[in-house]
């Protein structure tokens, strides 16, 4: 009984630690007090001011564009890489697997400096393309690991049976592997989107003044105090992220049920 109460209290403390700051942020986005120290009444004026803050909206647009592109490319390349690591034997396979974990475990500052040196050596101007390549680089291993873990749970006999029945490798990939891996693919995309949206360290090294993204914009703003418009924008992004997670899970579930029934 005591152990159950301790476990319940421990879990409650963890959830409170995780979600109370988010709740405070959402509440303050509707608080008429500019400093958010005490509640002074409900208002939506911070959302109205946000709509007129061109620099903040432009940074948000840049971040959303970067997150969508980097998540899409990282998911595409990472999913195919995971399939290759799962299905085929080739020279250098252990090296490729090891390098993926090296990228995942490397400190952000190390990756940031490495990418900056690479761009300088190649003569690439810092801006959209350097930032996109960098975000794809650090998102890619997470997609590979997520999709590969899903593939490892497959029944290999199903793939062998499809091959014995004359299915080509492309048909096996399209009809069996991808539909069954779709939940992991969707999870990899959402994870990549989130990693791209909140990255500060790598982005601060590899972006240029012509392409300012939201995390760097907010970081520069909070040095002189958190603006209520930032609370409003964070609330909108939080709702957007929640909608994407729910939608990706529903889409992945529907595709898994529908496509696996069509395998012949």
From Swiss-Prot:
Keyword set includes Cell division: no
Membrane topology: Multi-pass membrane protein
Primary site of residence: membrane
CDD domains: TM_PBP2
Protein keywords: Cell inner membrane, Cell membrane, Membrane, Transmembrane, Transmembrane helix, Transport
Gene3D superfamilies: MetI-like (1.10.3720.10)
BP-aspect Gene Ontology terms: putrescine transport; spermidine transmembrane transport
Keyword Signal annotated: no
PROSITE patterns: ABC_TM1 (PS50928)
Periplasmic side: 28-65, 121-128, 197-231
GO MF annotation, one: ABC-type polyamine transporter activity
Function recorded in the entry: Required for the activity of the bacterial periplasmic transport system of putrescine and spermidine.
Descriptive protein name: Spermidine/putrescine transport system permease protein PotC
Species this protein is from: Escherichia coli (strain K12)
């Amino acid at each position: 009984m005591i152990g159950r109460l301790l476990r319940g209290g421990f879990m409650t403390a963890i959830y409170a630690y995780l979600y109370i700051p988010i709740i405070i942020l959402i509440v303050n986005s509707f608080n008429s007090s500019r400093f958010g120290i005490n509640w002074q009444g409900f208002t939506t004026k911070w959302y109205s001011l946000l709509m007129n803050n061109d620099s903040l909206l432009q940074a948000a647009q840049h971040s959303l564009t970067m997150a969508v592109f980097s998540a899409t490319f990282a998911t595409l390349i990472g999913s195919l890489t995971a399939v290759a690591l799962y299905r085929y034997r080739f020279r250098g396979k252990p090296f490729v697997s090891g390098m993926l974990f090296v990228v995942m475990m490397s400190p952000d500052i190390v990756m940031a400096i490495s990418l900056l040196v690479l761009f300088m050596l190649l003569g690439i101007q810092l801006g959209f393309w350097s930032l996109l390549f960098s975000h794809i680089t650090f998102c890619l291993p997470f997609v590979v690991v997520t999709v590969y873990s899903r593939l490892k749970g497959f029944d290999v006999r199903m793939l062998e049976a499809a091959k014995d029945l004359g299915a080509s490798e492309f048909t096996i990939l399209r009809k069996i592997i991808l539909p069954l891996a779709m939940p992991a693919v969707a999870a990899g995309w959402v994870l990549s989107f989130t990693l791209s949206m909140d990255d500060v360290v790598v982005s601060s090294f590899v972006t240029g003044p012509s392409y300012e993204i939201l995390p760097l914009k907010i970081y520069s703003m909070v040095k002189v105090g958190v603006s209520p418009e930032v609370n409003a924008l964070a609330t909108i992004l939080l709702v957007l992220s929640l909608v994407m997670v729910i939608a990706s899970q529903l889409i992945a579930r529907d595709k898994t049920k529908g496509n696996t029934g069509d395998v012949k």
